[in-house]
Amino acid sequence: ALIEVNKLDRRKLEAYHIGFVLGPCVNASGRLESAALSLKLWLEEDYRKAVPMAAELKSLNDSRKEMTEAGVRQAVRLLERETEKEYTDTVNVQVSDTENQERQKNAVEELSSDKQDKVLILYLPDCHESLAGIIAGRIRERYHKPTIVLTDAEEGVKGSGRSIEAYDMFAHLSACKDLFDKF
């Protein structure tokens, strides 16, 4: 049913279609809602019942694509602002005490000590938390820099990062892990 809903010819299916058309449809329900719909589709033996489930998965994936592109556009707008002041004013991270605020400020200053940011850290409050990593990956590809995307989640600010080969993001984040609620 998922093959037909995506208008694919089952006789000409290739790895590309599985990895970049069908797979993302199955994955979208888990990203945006619950993986239950994908599981129900896999277990459904009645084709007539499977078609609406497949259509819903395709719709969720289409929504995920639109939300991802909107997040990427928002991130690019933030990065391409004219002045550093405009850029830094968009980020409002709350920390619990003055010592952490000072350490956080020093860490940001160190990362941005020259004209070019070494690591891009973006706060996109309206970004769906499950899309932060995809958006970070797209920004990393575009700017060739390690990127962290932060967004609002139920338990506070949550983030996802994507790095480049020349930068050990895990090591750098580990060095300041006491600044995070979870790491």
Where are the model-predicted features located?
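Hydrophobic helix-and-loop "lid/oligomerization" segment in the mid-to-C-terminal part
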Residues: A1-F183
